Each structure stands twice: as C-alpha cells, then as structure tokens.
Amino acid sequence: MKEHIAVDRNTYDQVMLPIYSPAQFIPVRGQGSRVWDQHGKEYIDFAGGIAVVALGHCHPTLVDVLKQQGEKLWHISNIFTNEPALILAQKLIDATFAERVFFANSGAEANEAAFKLARHYAIARHNPYKTKIIAFHQGFHGRTLFTVSVGGQPKYADGFGPKPADIIHVPFNDLDAVKAVIDDHTCAVVLEPVQGEGGVTAAAPAFIHGVRELCDKHQVLLVFDEVQSGMGRTGKLFSYMHYDVTPDIITTAKALGNGFPISAMLTTVNIASVMTPGAHGTTYGGNPLACAVANVAFDIINTPAVLAGVEKRHNLMVNFLNDINQKYSIFGEIRGKGLLIGAELKAPHQGKAKDILQLAAENGLMLLSAGGDVLRFTPSLIISEEEIAQGMERLEQVINQLV
C-alpha cells in the first residue's frame, strides 16, 4: 500500500457518498479560531464545526489529555464501566437537574435514546396508547429515521419510506397550537430552546413556561434537545437555565467533546428507572478516550470566565453585524442567543446564504447557513476580540462584493 495518497477536492466527488456539498478547499490544520487549507491559506473560523469546537481547534489542554488517555485505555465496551465515564457523568449530574446519564456518540443517538425513553416511560407508567410525540416545524433532531421524523423538516425526512407513527408537528413558539394537540395520549413534547438548523430562532420564555405547564397537566415529558444550544453556547451551561424551567430529559453532544465524538442524554432517577439491562445500548458510547477529553472540555467550559465571556462576544458580534447592516441594509433580523447567532437576509438577497458562504471562503472566512435565508455564526466560545474583528472585516468585504 502506498504510504501517501494525494487528494484534493475533486477526490471527494470520486470516493464519497454524495450527501454533502463541501467547500472547494480542504482544511488541514487548525489552531484556536484559525484554520489553514492544503495551500497554506488562512481562514477565520466563525463556523466552529457547527457549534462543536467551543474551545477552538487543537486546544493544548485537550491535546494533552487525548495523548495521555491514548496511552492508557481506548475502548472496553459497555460490558465494563470505566473511570472517565463515571467522572463525567457525575460532573453532568452535579451541574444540572439530572440524576442519571446515558452516553452515546452523536446528537442523533442521544435524541434517539431520549425519544425511546419517553415512549417507554409513558407505556410503562401509564398505558400502551400514550405514544404521541409533539415536535415543531423547522426543528432538527438528527438523521436516524426516528429522529429525522421527529424533526420538522420534510426535506430531510421524505423519500425513505414509512416513518415512525404518532408524531405531530406544530408551529414553534405557538402555545395555542400545542394546546390544540396535546392530550392524555401524548408521551413527550420535544423542542430545541434555540432552533439551530431551523433558522436560529430562540424559544420565547412565555412559550417555554406554557409548554411546561401543559406537560405537567397531561403527564407528558418535556424533552430539550440541547445538542447545539448546550455546553455554554448560549452563555449558560445549558439553555434551559435561561428560562427557569426544568425539563425531564435533555440531550447534549457537539461541544461536549470539542470535536471528539461523544453525546449524552440526561434525566431523573424516576424516569430512568423504567430502563433495564438490554433496553437500549451502544458499543462505543461512554468509551474512556471520548470521556477523558470531554471531562477536560467540560471543566474549561463550565467556568464563570468562559460562560460570562459568551455574552460579551455575542454583543461584539451583533454590534459588528448591525454596523454592516447600517451600511448595506442586507439583514432583516439579527437574532439568537450567546454565540448561536443568525442574520436573516432580506430581499433581494433572500435565498443567497450559500452564495455568501462561498464568497466568504474565498475571502478567508468560514461561515454557516441555516436554510437559504440565514447566515449562522457558531464560533469558539473563547474566540478573541481581534479574531472577531478580522472575521467581520472579511464578512463586510463579502457583503460589499454581493451588493
């Protein structure tokens, strides 16, 4: 076998399943909030791996723990437990309402576990007909057949044959719509405190409180998908903490491992008690390598300095976006929480988010979209003010080119 195979962007089209349309450059190295491609070109990273690298690329403390654990123990399966997993579970419990933790590898897997648990709990504690799940238009919960069906975006869910039954979608932030469909056959209401893929729309406090009251009235579990909004992204460790409302189940992933694949589902003793050995599982979930990295990432993120810094950086980025908008009048709304920010394009630039992403890459800036009309910003939680300013300068160059 050859020691080195030369690859470029064209190689992707020749060897990969055509389910993505990646940028024309290939990143090969990252440090903090900067990335370099195969040709040495530098980029400011406002994408953060889609809200994953909360502490930036190749954080030295995380690199050290990865090396250290890599020389100890990588994987042993769920037939045994391990120290890093137990330590991480205890940290998550100490920092939240939760009392029990399940580890998996991705947000989709954590959500799959949450939805299965919600149905299993309702059937075990109530009756076999209490299986309806209420979710929201423009929601996103993963790509398994169950999670993509709970997600409220037909463009992702259609075309794969019969979907899991008993899933209803209603408009986000519409409490009356929830009231109209919730009943004693409902097992769960599932929502993102901030819809990420759906356009970076935050839940209104009155809506969250109203949903909690409806869930209590009908003995329904409230599930918060915090895969994108959790782990400090909005300035609190988890977004539910902004609302003075306690969900029954939360899921987290993405920034939990700062890029090393790991996810978790958190719940209470009472709800977890319906699960027995064999009721659910995963081969890789909670492996010592992932949990060792996540332990250190958690320790760094869950500090006053990092969490308070999120709001400061939010204000700085929004101020820059407002300044750009003053000059070019391109955004209809700038919204979001913390460092999960959306800038909605207005006419005549609606639908051009992907074009802006391409222009941004050409100008040395990594950006995201949330649909065709919204630019999404999910940088590192510790990105420097200088890097924010440089990135926004590059964004303004892009907007100037566009208009």
From Swiss-Prot:
Coiled coil where?
none
Primary localisation category: cytoplasm
Q: Where in the cell is it found?
A: Cytoplasm
Q: Which GO terms describe its cellular component?
A: cytoplasm
Q: By its UniProt entry, which InterPro entries does this protein fall under?
A: Ac/SucOrn_transaminase_bac (IPR017652), AcOrn/SuccOrn_fam (IPR004636), Aminotrans_3 (IPR005814), Aminotrans_3_PPA_site (IPR049704), Class-III_PLP-dep_AT (IPR050103), PyrdxlP-dep_Trfase (IPR015424), PyrdxlP-dep_Trfase_major (IPR015421), PyrdxlP-dep_Trfase_small (IPR015422)
Give residues where N6-(pyridoxal phosphate)lysine occurs: K254
* Residues reported to bind N(2)-acetyl-L-ornithine: R143, T282
Q: What class of enzyme is it?
A: transferase
- Co-factor note (free text): Binds 1 pyridoxal phosphate per subunit.
* MF annotations from Gene Ontology: identical protein binding; N2-acetyl-L-ornithine:2-oxoglutarate 5-aminotransferase activity; pyridoxal phosphate binding; succinyldiaminopimelate transaminase activity
Record keywords, A-Z = Amino-acid biosynthesis, Aminotransferase, Arginine biosynthesis, Cytoplasm, Lysine biosynthesis, Pyridoxal phosphate, Transferase
**SUPFAM superfamilies recorded:** PLP-dependent transferases
Per the entry, which co-factors are needed? pyridoxal 5'-phosphate
- Give any single GO term for biological process: lysine biosynthetic process via diaminopimelate
- Reaction(s) catalysed by this chain's protein: N(2)-acetyl-L-ornithine + 2-oxoglutarate = N-acetyl-L-glutamate 5-semialdehyde + L-glutamate; N-succinyl-(2S,6S)-2,6-diaminopimelate + 2-oxoglutarate = (S)-2-succinylamino-6-oxoheptanedioate + L-glutamate
Task: Give the pathway annotation.
Answer: Amino-acid biosynthesis; L-arginine biosynthesis; N(2)-acetyl-L-ornithine from L-glutamate: step 4/4; Amino-acid biosynthesis; L-lysine biosynthesis via DAP pathway; LL-2,6-diaminopimelate from (S)-tetrahydrodipicolinate (succinylase route): step 2/3
**EC number(s)?**
2.6.1.11, 2.6.1.17
Q: Any idea what job this protein has? A: Involved in both the arginine and lysine biosynthetic pathways.
- Subunit structure of this entry? Homodimer.
What family does the database annotate? Belongs to the class-III pyridoxal-phosphate-dependent aminotransferase family. ArgD subfamily.
Protein name as catalogued:
Acetylornithine/succinyldiaminopimelate aminotransferase
What is the protein's species of origin?
Answer: Photorhabdus laumondii subsp. laumondii (strain DSM 15139 / CIP 105565 / TT01)
Gene symbol? argD
